[in-house]
């Protein structure tokens, strides 16, 4: 009886730690779009993308060597390549390009369908068969976002909207692939090896696209790049994957739904961007759809 009580206590403690770590991860991710917006106002989007990947890659390499982590097998290289192409290069680059045309507040609306994108790719890649109501919520959420983009009309760039949609699709694919791979390779090790394997591309490209007069770039832009590399691309994932492992993917994964709200608050407070009531309503609508697809899927 006492043994069962002790085990329940340990499980409850682990679950609580998982929620705390997951919350920290989401909180760190929430600064990604505002930080990217600040950076691309003065820096080449390709430089911002490769610099964040290179910074994360160097930090990850140090950690992998320090903890003497085993190298990925040949069978794990292809999934890692998908994570790298989608999550390390694709999503950051496309979102950075999109933020040259739209505000970070506008882009955050699209993050509301990221959990849905991940779930769809989990179905396609993992062979899961969710209930029909899952697809109902998925389609409804997508229509809300598309409708929002269309209704913006001249106040929003079609180029920015399309780039964000493609970015979300790539990110969803990389998340789903990474989730599968983490079962055999480990959570934080997946993102670590992905950014390390990207170094042969990210490091040279960072220097090739670096500004010719770095002294003319504002401190805010450099802080944005540093934040993206250290927190968004690396430390955030360490907390996120640790939280998923401790508290369970299904439960802790719900915390990702808070990201648009945190991001909108940062966009309004740090960038003085206008957050319209429509943005808030659309974000809330998408979150309700994602929650529904999670519950009934």
Q: Where on the chain are the PLM-derived regions?
A:
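Specific transmembrane alpha-helical segments of multi-pass solute transporters/efflux pumps
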Residues: 27-28, 32-33, 61-111, 147, ...
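C-terminal-most transmembrane helix of multi-pass membrane proteins
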Residues: 2-11, 51-54, 150, 221-223, ...
């Amino acid at each position: 009886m006492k043994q069962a009580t002790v085990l329940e206590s340990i499980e409850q403690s682990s679950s609580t730690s998982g929620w705390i770590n997951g919350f920290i991860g989401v909180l760190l991710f929430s600064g990604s779009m505002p930080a990217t917006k600040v950076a691309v106002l003065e820096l080449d989007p390709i430089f911002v993308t490769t610099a964040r990947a290179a910074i994360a890659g160097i930090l990850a390499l140090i950690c992998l060597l320090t903890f003497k982590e085993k190298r990925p097998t040949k069978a794990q290289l292809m999934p890692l390549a998908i994570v790298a192409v989608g999550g390390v290069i694709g999503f950051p680059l496309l979102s950075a390009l999109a933020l040259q045309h739209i505000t970070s507040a506008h882009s955050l609306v699209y993050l509301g369908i990221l959990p849905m994108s991940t779930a769809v790719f989990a179905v396609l890649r993992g062979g899961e068969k969710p209930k029909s109501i899952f697809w109902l919520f998925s389609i409804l959420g997508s229509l809300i976002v598309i409708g929002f983009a269309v209704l913006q009309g001249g106040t929003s760039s079609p180029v920015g909207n399309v780039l964000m949609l493609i970015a979300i699709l790539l990110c969803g694919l990389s998340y789903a692939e990474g989730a599968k791979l983490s079962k055999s390779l480990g959570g934080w090790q997946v993102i670590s090896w992905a950014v390390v394997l990207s170094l042969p591309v990210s490091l040279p490209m960072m220097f090739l696209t670096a500004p010719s007069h770095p002294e003319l770039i504002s401190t805010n832009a450099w802080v944005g790049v540093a934040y993206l590399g250290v927190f968004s691309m690396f430390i955030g994932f360490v907390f996120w994957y640790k939280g998923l492992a401790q508290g369970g993917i299904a439960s802790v994964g719900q915390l990702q739904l808070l990201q648009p709200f945190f991001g909108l608050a940062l966009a309004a407070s740090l960038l003085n961007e206008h957050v319209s009531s429509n943005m808030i309503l659309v974000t809330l609508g998408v979150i309700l759809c994602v929650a529904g697809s999670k519950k009934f899927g």
